[in-house]
Amino acid sequence: MTATPLTNLFLRAPDITHVAPPYCLNATWQAETAMHTSKTDSACVAVRSYLVRASCETSGTIHCFFFAVYKDTHHTPPLITELRNFADLVNHPPVLRELEDKRGVRLRCARPFSVGTIKDVSGSGASSAGEYTINGIVYHCHCRYPFSKTCWMGASAALQHLRSISSSGMAARAAEHRRVKIKIKA
């Protein structure tokens, strides 16, 4: 099997123009079962649940940060398939090494990014107008002290990584568009 050049990967990346700062999810998961386990946030008035879809090869407890991502200035959310493609790209080993290089720390997990969902449902008797579902990118962490300063520094590095990769995808598509225009004129 031949390796896919990174430029081709960036051309296929979804068009993500905005990555919001991290939101810490008030729950923990067992890494082995996090792919299909939904957790409910007991601190919320409404019923709020989190699905992180983490596929982790490391065992133990994980905690997560959620990043809302949008495709344009109108805050159009990407489709789940686009989010999966983006998570696959940022988890691609050469791309993930960039995050490790920025942090100066080796990650304990080969796939720290996944597609996540926050679902908020109004309490009984309330109107359905307050219900919402947000899909985005989740970064999970294995550190011993959830949401400590070190953990937040990792989430901040993950935010910068996501923003950098989304910018690289937009730049690759713009360059390809210019190449196509030049070929057509020639």
Curated annotation (Swiss-Prot):
Q: Where are the transmembrane segments?
A: none
Tell me, which GO biological process terms does this entry list? viral life cycle
Q: Could you say which protein family the record assigns here?
A: Belongs to the alphaherpesvirinae HHV-1 UL55 family.
Q: What are its GO cellular component terms?
A: host cell nuclear matrix; viral tegument
Sorted alphabetically, the keyword list is: Host nucleus, Virion, Virion tegument
- Entry's InterPro entries? Herpes_UL55
Q: What is this protein called?
A: Tegument protein UL55
Is the keyword Mitochondrion in the record?
no
Q: Where located?
A: Virion tegument; Host nucleus matrix
